[in-house]
From Swiss-Prot:
GO terms, molecular function: endonuclease activity; metal ion binding
Subunit annotation: Monomer.
Gene3D superfamilies listed in its UniProt record: 3.30.1330.30, eRF1 domain 2, Pelota, domain A
Cellular component per GO, a single term: cytoplasm
The protein's role, per its UniProt record: May function in recognizing stalled ribosomes, interact with stem-loop structures in stalled mRNA molecules, and effect endonucleolytic cleavage of the mRNA. May play a role in the release non-functional ribosomes and degradation of damaged mRNAs. Has endoribonuclease activity.
PANTHER family in the record: PELOTA, PROTEIN PELOTA HOMOLOG
Enzyme Commission code(s) on record: 3.1.-.-
Cofactor: a divalent metal cation
The protein, known as: Protein pelota homolog
Source organism of this protein record: Metallosphaera sedula (strain ATCC 51363 / DSM 5348 / JCM 9185 / NBRC 15509 / TH2)
SUPFAM superfamilies: Dom34/Pelota N-terminal domain-like, L30e-like, Translational machinery components
One Pfam family it belongs to: eRF1_1
Keywords: Cytoplasm, Endonuclease, Hydrolase, Metal-binding, Nuclease
Amino acid sequence: MKILEYDEKTGALRLHVENEDDLWLIHLVLSKGDIVVARTTRDVSMGNDSRRVPMVVELEVEFSEFQPFTSRLRIHGIVRDAPERYGIKGSHHTINLDIGDEIVIIKKWTKGLIDRIRKQAEKNKRVLIVLTDQDELLVALPMEQGIRILTERSLPGVSDEDKSLESVALEVSKEVEQYVKQYSPDAVIIAGPGPFKEIVRDKLKIKPRIYVDNVSSASRAGLNEILRRDIIDEVMRDYQISVASRELERGLSLLAQGSSLVVYGRDEVERASQIGAVETLLVTDDLLTLEDEETRRKTEAIMEAVESKGGKVMIVPKDSPVYLQLKNLTGLLAILRFRIN
């Protein structure tokens, strides 16, 4: 994401969308009543005919839709300004925002929202995770919106079809090279339970740096192991998803011990945030996209309070491995600096 222009007085923020995570963040920050300006197309009647015409419109947002791991955000609303000759003011319209597009968002920006936009604009690292042994292959791409599984399949056994270990490793390396070409990661982590991963590594012909680690299996369980380890921070310090996994694990451990250094639920978390007790706040992303504006505003206010007092806020997307655990705890969990009871 690139911030092209920001007018603090009018609240107009012009952005250039560079990847799917940018779209996800825009989806999270948009609220009903915000104004967006973007290029779009619309069917316009021309006499007896109609054709799709490109134009720039100003839209008052009603709601937005984003499907994780897609390259399009749909913004629905009412046209407030458009070329007069098309007569579409006051009509419903949907802007399809894609990677590479520009958008102007006009709203009342809180410090927390602007900080999240700026933080996203500073991010640039992407890592590809490859879990493999001679029987299985899983390739994943951690993103702000969750873990995108690119492939998860069984490999032809070494004894099948006269396949040798070397030939299976070559097959895996070629597939990984295609993903590297497609997603341009800054680094690749190859992990697995045995020596097969080193054979794959030796056959890879790629520019990104390669890291190797051991896990118990080339499966989603192995992926969760990687996300909890320090190696992930070496190559993806900008991603919250691995840190969030470990922070939730810490919070659950404190709960199991009956510790007063962890609270969950809106009322308890809100109270802790107001007195500066929150060290780390975990929030499920659906609390920021609710149609219930009051709940959304209260959640954003809690996040603002935590950040203003030096606490960390981590947004946990639906595709995160820890989403359901956090959701079962109301979607809000705070690890505290000091006891408040």
